[in-house]
Amino acid sequence: MKLLVFAGSTRLGSYNRKLARETAALARERGAEVTHLELGDYDVPMYNADVEAVGTPPDVMKLKQVFYEHAAWIICTPEYNASYPALVKNTLDWLSSPVKGDPVWNDDFRFSRGKVVGVLSASPGALGGLRSQSHLIPLLLNLHCWVAPHTFALGRAGSAFDEQDKLRDDTARQRIAAVVEQTLWAASRLQPESAATK
């Protein structure tokens, strides 16, 4: 099963990037074919219809294909002002924008339709980003994704990782593994392998 894991942050010491690395490792242990994506590796401007009218940026086209090729995604989202960050919204806005005149990418939801998505978050606060999840999940549903019922929010993230950026708490690791397992299980049933590799 092809699984895409990414964090909604580009900060060097981001808790959610650390969480994404841990999640990717747990998924590989469970037999998934994991792509750990760093959004900072792609040059994606703020969405602007005037920019789009000139031509969809090349890195947006690359991301469309990457997201499409994976049957399942796991998103590790920060929480900014009780919601998800602009990086996540901007990425999904670009990916869901049809490419006029392109027979493949003229469908808004080609990249996302039927994808199974697991949602994780990490935050220095006690709630661990739960409010971010509560805003992100409706967006994913609007993109015709199936969101795994199991989620996990890592609170007090500033002290949750050791010097090697590994989680200190086995219980947290088990909760993340539960999200991974449910996401992979659902994807194996809801997203035919052929559709994820065309």
Features from the language model and the residues they span:
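Helix-loop-strand module that forms the ligand-binding subsite of alpha/beta enzymes
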Residues: 56-143
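N-terminal beta-loop-helix "entrance" segment that forms/cooperates
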Residues: 39-57, 160-164
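A general structural signal for well-ordered alpha-helical segments in protein cores
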Residues: 16, 20, 60, 88, ...
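Glycine-rich phosphate/pyrophosphate-binding loop and the adjoining helix
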Residues: 1-4, 146-198
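A generic structural motif
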Residues: 30-35, 145
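Cofactor-binding loop segments of dinucleotide-utilizing enzymes, especially the Rossmann-like FAD-
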Residues: 8, 39, 122
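N-terminal beta1-alpha1 ligand-phosphate binding loop
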Residues: 1-32
